[in-house]
Regions:
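C-terminal non-catalytic scaffold/interaction domains in large multidomain proteins
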Residues: 1-354
Length: 354
């Protein structure tokens, strides 16, 4: 079986995108119309609002909107009729790339796939502009729910793709906790997990961390502060950790802004109710069932639950289930604290309150 030819530099270089955009702009006869398009799409600098362009050109923002719409309609018709070859060239490259990315991708991911480290905000803007004019591509415009994305038109228009993205978000919500793309794919009616991943990537309501996807508000996939990062580290470890070990794990993680001090970690562990101190500098998640408070508090809780006095060995055994402390510390508490009363050899109960 013959292998597909590797991509050449000419096929995906920044120069090709730049040349294509210049060729497209060359199809716009009036300079003022070119000005509107370049500024609205940010083809040479940052994107500008209708109002900003209107002030520059001395026309109303509504007039700018009308002109932009009319220009794009003309360009799309010309592209559809094959009169702007540059659009067809870019379209061909984008469709080939999208076919490998699940038929849909954010403009940021698509540009990175094409240009690698050469991807810039300017190249993203130019690819998005060219895609807008390509008849075989669908563009999802950015808003509060969706990222700017490009899809293969054969598989859906903007409305259909948005609906599919919404279905992925609904699937995550229904599951109620982070899950892998493969698990999500089993819940949804799509041909391949890569398409589910592509749809999930377009939503502004989802985040992913270490191959797990979930809602933005879930700290396990979108840790926003030090406390959330501590929570994720402990959850991944699955067992109690010393605060210095937690700090080291955060520094070695894939988190953004992971330059933290050991003291900062310790301070956050103390403040957050999700974390329980169970030994000297050792913390666990509250959800694991470890008890809070002092060793004496833990012993009191154990004796209160018991219907009869307990032997010290049994007390030690039960304390160690919820605390990481030395056995001698437990015995010292039993022998020295006034809350406990020995009723037989090595057997204790709670002292009667006076």
């Amino acid at each position: 079986m013959s292998q597909a030819p590797a991509k050449t530099t000419d096929e995906t270089s920044t120069v090709d995108i730049d040349s294509a955009v210049e060729a497209i702009l060359g199809a716009i006869e009036q300079e003022r119309e070119r000005e509107i398009i370049t500024r609205r799409f940010g083809l040479y600098d940052r994107k500008e609002t209708l109002e900003q362009i209107g002030e520059l050109l001395g026309i109303t923002r509504e007039r700018v909107r009308q002109l932009e719409k009319a220009i794009l309609v003309r360009l799309k018709i010309a592209s559809d009729e094959g009169k702007i070859p540059a659009v067809q060239s870019v379209e061909k490259v984008l469709i080939r790339e999208l076919s490998e990315m699940g038929r849909l991708a954010t403009v940021a991911d698509l540009t990175k796939a094409l240009l690698g480290d050469k991807a810039t905000p300017l190249s993203r803007a130019r690819i998005a502009f060219a895609a807008t004019l390509a008849p075989r591509l669908t563009v999802i415009n950015e808003n509060d729910n969706y990222k700017n994305a490009v899809g293969i038109a054969e598989y859906g228009d903007e409305k259909k793709l948005m609906k599919q993205v919404d279905a992925v978000v609904a699937g995550v919500k229904k599951h109620g906790q982070p899950l892998t793309i493969e698990e999500l794919h089993e819940q949804l009616d799509h041909e391949h997990p890569s398409h589910v991943r592509a749809l999930a990537s377009v939503s502004k309501h989802l985040s992913n961390l270490k191959d797990l996807w979930g809602l933005n508000k879930w700290p396990t996939v979108n840790p926003k502060n030090i406390r959330d990062k501590i929570y994720v580290i402990l959850l991944e470890k699955g067992s109690p950790m010393h605060f210095s070990e937690i700090a080291d794990s955060i520094k070695e993680s894939d988190f953004s802004r992971k330059d933290v001090t050991t003291q900062a970690i310790h301070n956050e562990l103390i403040k957050d109710k999700r974390f329980v101190l169970i030994g000297r500098g050792i913390y666990a998640l509250d959800s694991w069932g470890y008890s809070k408070g002092t060793v004496a508090d833990t012993i009191i809780g154990i004796l209160k639950k018991s219907s009869e006095p307990l032997h010290r060995d049994e007390i030690v055994k039960r304390v160690l289930k919820s605390r990481q402390v030395k056995e001698t510390t437990i015995l010292l508490n039993l022998q020295s604290k006034p809350q406990f009363k020995r009723v037989a050899k090595a057997t204790y109960t709670l002292a009667e309150e006076k």
